[in-house]
Amino acid sequence: MQVLPPGSTGGPSRLFILRPVATTLLMAAILLAGIIGYRLLPVAALPEVDYPTIQVVTLYPGASPDVMTSAVTAPLERQFGQMSGLKQMSSQSSGGASVVTLQFQLTLPLDVAEQEVQAAINAATNLLPSDLPNPPIYSKVNPADPPIMTLAVTSNAMPMTQVEDMVETRVAQKISQVSGVGLVTLAGGQRPAVRVKLNAQAVAALGLTSETVRTAITGANVNSAKGSLDGPERAVTLSANDQMQSADEYRRLIIAYQNGAPVRLGDVATVEQGAENSWLGAWANQAPAIVMNVQRQPGANIIATADSIRQMLPQLTESLPKSVKVTVLSDRTTNIRTSVRDTQFELMLAIALVVMIIYLFLRNIPATIIPGVAVPLSLIGTFAVMVFLDFSINNLTLMALTIATGFVVDDAIVVIENISRYIEKGEKPLAAALKGAGEIGFTIISLTFSLIAVLIPLLFMGDIVGRLFREFAVTLAVAILISAVVSLTLTPMMCARMLSQQSLRKQNRFSRACERMFDRVIASYGRGLAKVLNHPWLTLSVAFATLLLSVMLWIVIPKGFFPVQDNGIIQGTLQAPQSSSYASMAQRQRQVAERILQDPAVQSLTTFVGVDGANSTLNSARLQINLKPLDARDDRVQQVISRLQTAVATIPGVALYLQPTQDLTIDTQVSRTQYQFSLQATTLDALSHWVPKLQNALQSLPQLSEVSSDWQDRGLAAWVNVDRDSASRLGISMADVDNALYNAFGQRLISTIYTQANQYRVVLEHNTASTPGLAALETIRLTSRDGGTVPLSAIARIEQRFAPLSINHLDQFPVTTFSFNVPEGYSLGDAVQAILDTEKTLALPADITTQFQGSTLAFQAALGSTVWLIVAAVVAMYIVLGVLYESFIHPITILSTLPTAGVGALLALIIAGSELDIIAIIGIILLIGIVKKNAIMMIDFALAAEREQGMSPRDAIFQACLLRFRPILMTTLAALLGALPLMLSTGVGAELRRPLGIAMVGGLLVSQVLTLFTTPVIYLLFDRLSLYVKSRFPRHKEEA
């Protein structure tokens, strides 16, 4: 039975100090649960914050943007607009393709959104054109989200059509079945087909038309039910040779008779095996390829999805011929893993630095071991709670744990320092542990709950930013809570068993030198503090000046949204004149690709030309540039982008827009640059009037660079103006005219070839090699009422006009999106303000609306809520401190330290050339929690000295400052060194971590110096104020 001195209660720690075995086993359980949790946690770049997004693609080869808008997009939009939970609907209608992107509220499950989309498509089916080759196809994917993996399939022995067929049937389908995969697209889509190229002159010479040929082909190739014979004993299934499978069979097809002689299709057309769409092409490192882009579902775990695909690839490639090569060109998870590893290393480095600081101050191995055990135990135990909350190991949660390193050690240091003080006075270790832990218990609780109060507003941040930082805040809060538990249980128990007067007094030369140094520092601080207390108004002036300076710095500092990351992948758009053809774009992309591949930082390149839903117009091309690993190149991604744009600038007739891919994607459409601003009107005419004016104004702003818009209304169009009276007299309808034009120039899919594995199309078109351009229209002939043929020119006049290449809608109304980057020397905040000022200058009419999109819109929302977020953090902390101290005054004293943290953080960011972005703001909020710890430790001891020893307020706060100087310095340095690895980070993802480290290190350095002097002065000021109030209102004193 242990004999305890009287009064050694130990508070909440008593039970754990007296039961070391139970305490040890409890901590072992926490450790084991954390280790198991770590192994179960998935790995990701960031928390899953994707909006539920679904893309609906409808292909209608040959249809103009106007036809796609009115006949396809508009009916779909009307049905989609009725869905509940829809946040935003955007669409793009271009030649032959309609893409509708539906973004839902964060709270709506993706499966529910999928059901609503399917129901809306079903409701719109009867409103869509009857000759659509395929119904609308939806995918659970955000088109702006870069692919998680890009594979190139090439062959030096097989045509791309055969390669595409094998990839589609043997590889793409299997990858699509992987859990987490939202969409697998085959860029360059050279699907096999039978192409029928009519010779217009030969057809006309025989008195035939393209419609005659089309009817003959569709009637000769069918695949329908034929029934069966059911006899008395046997049943017989009926089948026939109604399918034609090869180009040779179609070539021999009889389409008409002339003078009793058969006219075969091969007599009037070139029939060959080819590609379904001859205006699509993809290249990998300039070699023709089928480029397979794998996109994940919103919310899917990117690491698990990519791992499943890689495990499957060897088996899939074995089924392909040896001449077919599958190459993984990019895998976003490579950089994600590297970034997470770097952050894990920084976490371990932070732990090592914190333990080093502890040893430097305590200079005692047993005393160093105790917090050295508490830190990893608190961090590892957090993993168990993270599993329960469905969190992941990502950059933000690891950053939270790295910052927590400096937080969690504070509690252990405060406990050890207080217990050690009693042991050095001669008390037994057990009694000292009980007394010291009991005395410091309230302080630990105050520190813990006031720090968690700072994090509470983060949990209530709205929209995607709030969802993003929820894991950060909760992870940090859990680590702090576990730390408090460990500090009140394990730490005093270990102190009672491991510390003694002999071990604490045992010193070597190094220890004695450090002790002398600390004594001199404390003595100097005491002399300085005495002078400060004698001149309080000067100190108060400094505190007030600090507050004003923090406000001024907040106003002038450049503001951003989210750090631009170097993930080693660059997305690009190549833009050419609006009338550019597929052939000219293919040639231009070859020139650009040659320049890009010469850059030493580039590892591989994929390019794509054509219209397929991902790319909207023929005059644009998509690029994906994969850079070498960061440690294998000399330049960061922005420097590479500048160099590539300079290299391509000398190629005439092209504009290259590049942007680095990011882990956080908020946009719903692929953009040319990082930021977007939309202009919306009720009519296209209103847009056409204001778009040039606004674009010219934006291009003149120095705060913006690479300004462009998706407004393209100068595409060449041939307007067929039919004389309806003449056509009617000849018995020719508008449907006949449309069919004739579609047969000739629409790559019309007129029939389907069915096989056991796939379906292939028969494509009809005119061979325009000998009659390019508008001259090809002169070859069109139509069947008149009397059975003869009439040239199109007999009933129509051809006019050349300008027409839009694409028509974009936002929530069913016409819209144009301006894309821009922010040049060096300016911030996103500067650009946003410049755009708003320009909008006011132009005085846009009421029927014209503007709105920022994507990350720019999120920046506006975050910027508007930042001040309120900080205010909410301060108010929450005031409430918690007021409840703990049962005082209205003391919480104000503690919170008076906050401006010093803001000044230091903002100055550090400005000196480092960093913007005040979301990450840096989180750092400032955390500083609020750290800096007030110094004041809490001072005020707690001052109040205790006044109550228990009857000291005057001045003597009490003076003694408290001296007694708590060492633990304050120790805990501040621990927090500073915990953030230092983040500030000095240089690896993959360093852009994300560095602002947090800079803000915290700068804030801690400045606040450490100032709060040691301003806090006692403000404490005495409020004490005098309290006495004054009591003297003026004695009733308050009586009631008290």
Swiss-Prot record:
Keywords recorded for this protein, A-Z: Cell inner membrane, Cell membrane, Membrane, Transmembrane, Transmembrane helix, Transport
Entries under InterPro entries matching the protein: AcrB_DN_DC_subdom, Acrflvin-R, Multidrug-R_MdtB
Keyword Nucleotide-binding: no
Membrane topology: Multi-pass membrane protein
Superkingdom of the source species: Bacteria
Cellular component annotations (GO), alphabetically ordered: plasma membrane
Gene3D superfamilies, sorted: Multidrug efflux transporter AcrB pore domain, Multidrug efflux transporter AcrB pore domain like, Multidrug efflux transporter AcrB TolC docking domain, DN and DC subdomains, Multidrug efflux transporter AcrB transmembrane domain
Pfam families in the record: ACR_tran
Compartments it resides in: Cell inner membrane
Primary location recorded for the protein, binned into one broad class: membrane
Membrane-spanning ranges: 16-36, 347-367, 369-389, 396-416, 440-460, 472-492, 537-557, 863-883, 888-908, 910-930, 968-988, 998-1018
MF-aspect GO terms: xenobiotic transmembrane transporter activity
Keyword Iron attributed: no
Disulfide bonds: none
Family designation: Belongs to the resistance-nodulation-cell division (RND) (TC 2.A.6) family. MdtB subfamily.
Subunit structure: Part of a tripartite efflux system composed of MdtA, MdtB and MdtC. MdtB forms a heteromultimer with MdtC.
Protein name, as recorded: Multidrug resistance protein MdtB
Organism listed in the record: Salmonella paratyphi C (strain RKS4594)
